[in-house]
Amino acid sequence: MSAQNPLFSGSIVALVTPMNHYGEVDFSCLEKLVEHHIEAGSNALVSVGTTGESATLSIEENVKVIEKTVEFAKGRIPIIAGAGANATSEAITMTKLLRDSGVAGCLSVVPYYNKPTQEGMYQHFKAIAECTDLPQILYNVPSRTGSDMKPETVARLAEIENIVGIKEATGDVSRIVKIKQLAGKNFIVLSGNDTTGLEAIKLGAEGVISVTNNIAAKDMADMCRYALAGDFDKAEEINARLMRLHHDLFIESNPIPVKWAAYRLGLIKSPHLRLPLTTLSEEIQPKVEDALKIAGLL
């Protein structure tokens, strides 16, 4: 891995987990989604992250969905496994179960609800990294976890060999520069915010772990490819068309709007989510539909 050839880069899909009306994972639909993203030029898939409803899948279900995603990919696209938890022991269990699954790496979120200190975050991720040889991507999303992992803590963790990068989802693009300065140019920084993804790449991020690319996969792949090549005019043209969609896919809690949008576009058979998440409110649906039209998807 080097700054010129990072392990993970470009348009990375925060993949939805398709379900039927009974809340069971729809594996035939999942296989079609994997094919769709390969054909569209996506650079990697995150299986069972936040957008994949990791919080309401059991450990056994998490592992099965990830393993099936790897199986469907057939080595044609890297699969990153969502393997985080707010209990270090549970995150270690998940990570160990994925050791021989064929995943390219693991995405591990800052522990949520229990609000660890910076030292607690460091020890949490250090313990996970020490249990595996799999590349680890940190995930900082304070709006969901209630805790913000500071760039200085990220830099400490970057010294651990198999902690290779971070999904940075504060929305503060200045963090990209700060982390690069402290952690070094070979440490991968991936934007976790579609609205600021292009700006993040301009400031040195290697790509975007995106919700939007669930439904605009080719556009997002093209945007990231142009941006990483320095062709910002073409990247800006695509991003401007998608900006309303970037916003409206978070008009209710993620992944509620993106599942409805994927259903509306025929990419999945049902917009069903597991409780406590419910399908997109009827009064909100026209707004998301308008965003799809503005993006040129309808």
Swiss-Prot record:
Which reactions does this protein catalyse? L-aspartate 4-semialdehyde + pyruvate = (2S,4S)-4-hydroxy-2,3,4,5-tetrahydrodipicolinate + H2O + H(+)
- Site Part of a proton relay during catalysis: list residues: T50, Y113
The protein's location, in the record's own words, is: Cytoplasm
Matching Pfam families: DHDPS
Q: Which GO terms describe its biological process?
A: diaminopimelate biosynthetic process; lysine biosynthetic process via diaminopimelate
Lineage: superkingdom: Bacteria
Question: SUPFAM superfamilies annotated for this entry?
Answer: Aldolase
Q: Which residues bind pyruvate?
A: T51, I209
GO CC aspect terms: cytosol
The annotated active site, in chain numbering, is Y139, K167
Q: Which Gene3D superfamilies match?
A: Aldolase class I
Presence of the UniProt keyword Hydrolase in the record: no
User: What is the protein's quaternary organization?
Assistant: Homotetramer; dimer of dimers.
Please give the name of this protein: 4-hydroxy-tetrahydrodipicolinate synthase
Q: Which organism is it from?
A: Haemophilus influenzae (strain 86-028NP)
